């Protein structure tokens, strides 16, 4: 199976045979045809009001500099579109807003995939009384 995106022989990014500039000039329906099935279905069924607002914010922010002022959103289920490349989003992970800088390789994924909601637990050493056998261990 070939990958969805490639770096061409000139070092130019392509997504399913289209350069980034070509992708950014396409309409939303044309881009949807290139996306994976789940993301394509999301767009074909119609974006929600909140997702439409996020698209408008991204369109406005594309003309401005957003490095210092990321676009804040709770929409973890928003597919990453070519017009988002280069923008910075602050995606809510259930506790705080974390920065996600969109790169060309992220096209076709969801915003939430790049901001995890759970952290892995790193347990320390067991203490006194943690197990039945440790109740009678003498203290140092």
Curated annotation (Swiss-Prot):
One Gene Ontology term of the molecular function aspect: rRNA binding
Listed Gene3D superfamilies: 30s Ribosomal Protein S19, Chain A
Domain of life: Archaea
InterPro entries: Ribosomal_uS19 (IPR002222), Ribosomal_uS19_CS (IPR020934), Ribosomal_uS19_euk/arc (IPR005713), Ribosomal_uS19_SF (IPR023575)
GO cellular component: cytosolic small ribosomal subunit
Keywords of the record: Ribonucleoprotein, Ribosomal protein, RNA-binding, rRNA-binding
GO biological process, one term: translation
Positions in coiled-coil regions: none
Listed NCBIfam families: PRK04038.1 (NF003121), uS19_arch (TIGR01025)
HAMAP family reported in the protein's UniProt record: Ribosomal_uS19
Protein purpose: Protein S19 forms a complex with S13 that binds strongly to the 16S ribosomal RNA.
Similarity-based family: Belongs to the universal ribosomal protein uS19 family.
Record protein name field: Small ribosomal subunit protein uS19
Biological source species: Natronomonas pharaonis (strain ATCC 35678 / DSM 2160 / CIP 103997 / JCM 8858 / NBRC 14720 / NCIMB 2260 / Gabara)
